[in-house]
Amino acid sequence: MSAAFVDADTARVKANAVKFIQLLDSIHMDELKKDTANIYAVAMGTFESIKSNAQSILTMTDIQEMRKDFSMVSENLYPFFKIINYEGEKMYWQNCPMAFGDEKEANWVSKTKEVMNPYLGKNHPEHKATMLHCGTVKDTIKAQ
C-alpha cells in the first residue's frame, strides 16, 4: 500500500488494501497454536488489529485519514512479523519524524531500503515532493 500512499492515489490505496486483506485471510493463523498459547494469543490480537485498520481504509475518502489507519496497520505489522518469526523476503522498518505534523512521527514497512515516504509523498499540500525521501531505516526485517 505504501507506494499508493506516496502517490496519494486513494483508488489505488483501496485496491491495495483489498489485496492486503485477501493476503491476511490466506494466513493460516492456526499453525501458531503449535507454539505456546501466549504466542498464538498475542499474534491473533495483533493480526485482528492489522485487519481492522486495513478494512477501515476501505471506508475512507480522505488520504490523510487513510494514512492514519495505514500508520496503525504498520505499527501492528512490525511486531506481528517479530512474533511469528517472519520468513519472507527482506523488508525495512522505516520512520518519518514528521508524518502528521512536526511533532507526530509514524512508521511503515517497505520492500525497499530507499525511503519513499508514504505520509508526505509526492503530492503533499504543503511540502509537495520535497519530503519524499524524508525518513530513516530503523530496522531490517528478514528471515530468522
Segments (PLM) and residue ranges:
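Mature extracytoplasmic or organellar-lumen-exposed domains after removal of signal/transit peptides
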Residues: M1-Q144
